Amino acid sequence: MPKPRGRRVQSAFKERVENSEATHENSIAETGSDVEISLHEDQPQTSDNKNQGEFSSVFYGLVDSAEIDYFKQAESTLNANVFESDEDRAGFIRSVLEESRGKELKLVTNQICSKLMERLVLLASDRQLKHIFHQFLGHFPALAHHKYSSHVLETLLVRSAALIEKEIVNEYQQDEEDQDENADNDEDNFVASTTMESMFLQMLDQLEPYWSSMIQHQYASHVMRIIILIVSGKELPSSTMANSVLRSKKSKVARKMIEIKDNEDFNRAYQVPSSFKDRLRTIISAVSSPLDTKSARSLAIHKVASPVLQLIIRVEGIVDKERSVWHLIFLSEKAPKDSSEEAFVEYLLSDSVGSHFLEAIIKNDGARMKYIERLYRLYMKDRVLKLARRATTGVYIIQALLLKLKPGEVEHILDEIIPELSSLISISESQNIDLGKAIIDASISRFNYRRDELIEQLFQKFAPNYNVSDPSEDTTTELFENVLQLASSTLGNTRDDWPTAEERRRSLFLEKLMQYDYSFVVCVWLNCMALPQERLMQMCFHGVFSHVIEHALVVKPASEGEPKEVLILRKKFLNLFQGKIFELACNSYGSHIVDKLWDFTVLLPMYKDRIASEMMAQANRVKDSTYGRLVWKNWSMELFVRKKYDWKVLVKEQEENYYAEEGTQGDAMKKKKPIELKMEEIFKKKQYQEERAKREGEDLAGSNQKRMKGRGRNR
């Protein structure tokens, strides 16, 4: 690694730099001292972890220990948010910003103080935000390439986009307290009078020479992503969401650990001035002009550059109808199969980074549909099943294609996969469960295409011993074990373990199965009956598995009719909760289950009465609980205790609404007994005969004599 330039840096950090050359490329920034990035370093990096960059680490200045203690305490205070009012917090922020005046650059490049700067950016007023942005002018290329300041810069850019929109729609108003406090400061007045758009354009001018290298830089590439989203007017997603394009996986985890939360400026798109369209064209041109097909394809499979290239393909249609970047990577839509392109697509389908790239360009709206259809037709259509077996790469492409292709092609994919679905899903290795969910969604979108065969395949995989046509009570818990894997889960742990992402994924899949077909609901009932009651209650109190129980509390619609066998199983399933209603009602997760029991006990008034009686027996304790009070209210327990007749009227109304759900009234939808149908037929026939005889009698009387004028009561 080349040494930083400048006598000050060399003298202050001579020993540290010499050590860092042998150990770590970023060691200059290790001990809380922070670094800027030089703007004029043309020598290539020797480390494998960096691209050839124009920047090497340069020192801004040390933050002394007293300052670090002050700013660290300020960051903790803002994080705790113990202010009595918004005015108190605003005053505290003003004092911290005043203390940091002139020190912004060394604070933002300090590991500890950069967290404070990011909080200040999130909480600053519009005028304060402009001041921070102005302090960074002239240093944006350096800050974008720095490990710590790049994160602050990302947040600053999102807030700047919101401020630019305010200026466009004339909603920008200066904070009166800030204006009065700095009224005599010429610099602040100048900054306040400068538009955010003009400062943003100055930043883009400073970054313009570096676009082609930023795309491959570990930190600057994230800043570049946000800039592309802003100038194209696209939505700026949350920086903490799992699938966010703004942050790396490590950054999202770190933000959650230090409890930095996004404000209302995230998760939305903003109006942008017309000048931004030209800047978008400049960025795309700067990236694509030095590239040929070989280098463009290498960027597509580059770990750092690939996400940026995905964004460029997504937005290039705004300024380039010819889609030049797309055609650098792939051939035109009319081109036949090409051996070089075929080899590249095969690599995309086999490589983790490449498959992410191909999945993203299929899912987003940037690439034209005819481009996607050509790639599918030439290189994927004949081997759909083979690609679906690639559990870490190709299967995600198939899932993306199910969302985008025309109905005929979707049905072709379903024809290939559904007969082999049970062999594609691996329970032990947790593979292709999401494929099952995607196939269900695709089947629903095609009017339940091959529904029965799909259900058969799913049962064959997850409950091979279950008899769908004749469910019996001797069913085992195989569905739970195969889908949820309860034996190796956090269920029943006493260490307050958080549910894992894998448990959430599996629970959502089982919920999807229950939504798809009612036979899975009945199977879940029987699996619950096969569990020890203690284990079932643990599921009800679990942060994830409680949702499975909750989704199992559904009754067949009146239009379909509930078979007697299913009604009996529903009663037996309800018996599992007997004696546990109080515990469930007072639990944060179990209370939702008790709420669902109100609808689940429709047409079973005795069970509904029994549940309400259990709560009434523990009335004081239920009402002392936050969650219990909500359940008490949702079950209208005050009526049950004081006016039970009115409570029973509610129960009757629920039954009427259940039968009227298809738009008919009362008992019209109710399935009648044979004797009731016969009596109704006799009554209608008799009524018709009486009306006909009455009409014939009136006609006869009218033809033989005049109608007599009624008098008195008979009038």
From Swiss-Prot:
Residues 13-24, 688-698 have a biased composition (Basic and acidic residues). Keywords: Nucleus, Repeat, Ribosome biogenesis, rRNA processing. GO terms for molecular function: RNA binding. It comes from the Eukaryota. The keyword Disulfide bond does not apply. InterPro entries: ARM-like, ARM-type_fold, NOP9, Pumilio_RNA-bd_rpt. The keyword rRNA-binding does not apply. Residues 706-715 have a biased composition (Basic residues). PANTHER family: NUCLEOLAR PROTEIN 9. This is Nucleolar protein 9. It comes from Clavispora lusitaniae (strain ATCC 42720).
